[in-house]
Amino acid sequence: RTNIGEPLGQIYGYKAIGLYQTQEQLDNRPFVGNGVQRFGDIMYEDINGDGKITQDGDRVKIGHSTLPELNYSLSMDFNWKGFNLSALWQGAAIVSYTLNGTYSHGSMDNTVYTRPFYSGGNAPYYLVEDSWTPENVNARYPRLSAIHNGNNAYTSSWWLVNGNFLRLKNLQFGYTIPKKILAKANIGLSNVRVYVAGTNLFTFTEFKYCDPEMAIINNGYYPQQKNYSCLLYTSPSPR
């Protein structure tokens, strides 16, 4: 959803106010119109007070845009007696994303991050460990359901994630053999350098189960991979 005067990619959704814990809460809930609400389901605030939860009347701005307001990077390079250490950090700030995806005009969609066995996939460990049960009423996540649960699939502040991150994008450590040693060794080489390198080594972010650089939750994005390499660079002596 894009509105005049609002940031491109601003997230709109329902304001979650907790999980249903008592029969009184269920008896006095506003009409949601998607599924049957049970204990452990997400409660939404009736913003306009009409007794119904609707897109036109109750969706509000939640979080920040899905496009970072701030992108930053830091490049470092250290040299000492033939040794070299270089690093590239990059990150983003003032950005949000939701775990429930963006199908159905951004209003609702379960994903592998919000429902176990979604589309025949696996069940995230964190959902199983910290979902609502009668013995775990202070859970971080709503009750589990192996089938579609429309009430818990809505875009809402419940599934909002802080998208800020800092990533060690590239790290390289190497050593260049001094030319006088190569000349003395008389091995026909004028330059020898060996180094090890890695990419995407560390990421500091609030929600560790997603790649914070992904374009969208349910768009088939394959997370960036860690890579390690060890290289030897040589150049022959001039004739």
Each language-model region and where it sits:
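Outer-envelope beta-barrel architecture signal
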Residues: L70, K81-F83, N164, G188-V192, ...
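Conserved small-residue
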Residues: R1-H64, F117-N136
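Transmembrane beta-strands of outer-membrane beta-barrel pores
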Residues: W80-G82, G91-V95, N170, I177, ...
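Extracytoplasmic gating/loop element in the C-terminal half of outer-membrane beta-barrel translocons
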Residues: E6, Q10, A92-R193
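Membrane-embedded beta-strand positions of outer-membrane beta-barrel proteins
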Residues: A87, V194-V196, L232
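Conserved small/polar residues in nucleotide/adenosyl-binding loops
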Residues: Y233-R239
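Repeated loop/turn-to-beta-strand initiation elements of outer-membrane beta-barrel proteins
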Residues: G82-S86, K180-I181
